[in-house]
Amino acid sequence: PTVHPVWLGGLLFAAYLTRPTTAVFIVLTFVYLLWRKRREAGLTAVTAVGLLLLFVIYTRTTMGLWLPPYYLPQRLAGSGAPVPIVLYGLLFSPGRGLFTFSPMFLLVLLLAAWKWRALRQEPFYGLALAWIGLHTATLLRFEHWWGGHSFGPRLLTDIVPAFMLLTIVFARQWPAGLRPSRQRWLMGLGVLSVMFSVYVNSYAGLYQVATAVWNITPDIDRAPQYLFNWRYPQFTATTATNCAKVTE
């Protein structure tokens, strides 16, 4: 079963209303619809654009602006840091790196690249990769690409569904031709990466107060260099390590 175009348009607008960075996904969704389901694209677009116009009218009436500041492109002014540094920070840094906090996503990406010849025929394969790449590229232009006071890669949570799509697509093409020993090794690596990711994003993120205090010892918005300091990864923060940061 497929989602009715009216519902889909409403959901896409709701996604944008919640997080304006989902505009990347919305554009890709319309490209997919025009490619695969052209008959549904029109009604989906009319619904989404209609709701967007109502939002614009409401904002103009109540705030005197076409869109709230949170939605304006001025946020894409850039941080002034070199692009490779920001990319490393987004993906591998000890303070905000997506693959540092959730290595299972790195494994999924590597497996998807490994089987690209078999997976490239899957429409969701290209959609997921484009979503991940374009969203990450958008964040490279953010002034505060690390997402302010938060835990881990907050601004990259939008692309978690893209990694889920890749996982599903890869699972359908599970490499049955591999020797059993290699299949066991691959599954073991997957289990370990999932366990580490769950630990970091549940126990460390939810129940360790020190990981929240890490943002203010010192203020990470004023001392973003600590995003890259492997002596003080956020997910291993303790009262002692936070105090050590302050006294450096």
Language model features by range: what are they?
Residues V3, V24-V49, L109-R120, L165, ...:
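Perimembrane helix-loop-helix junctions
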Residues H4, T44, L119-I132, R182-G190:
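Membrane-interfacial loop-to-transmembrane alpha-helix junctions, especially the N-terminal start
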Residues T18, F101-L107, H149-R172:
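Hydrophobic/aromatic-rich transmembrane helices and adjacent perimembrane loops
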Residues R36-L111, Y125-L139, V160, F196-T211:
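Membrane-lumen/periplasm interface segments of specific transmembrane helices
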Residues L139-F151:
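Interfacial helix-loop-helix junctions of multi-pass membrane proteins
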Residues S150, M187-E248:
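Membrane-embedded, lumen/periplasm-facing catalytic core of multi-pass transferases
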Residues L166-L189:
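Cytosolic-side transmembrane helix boundary signature
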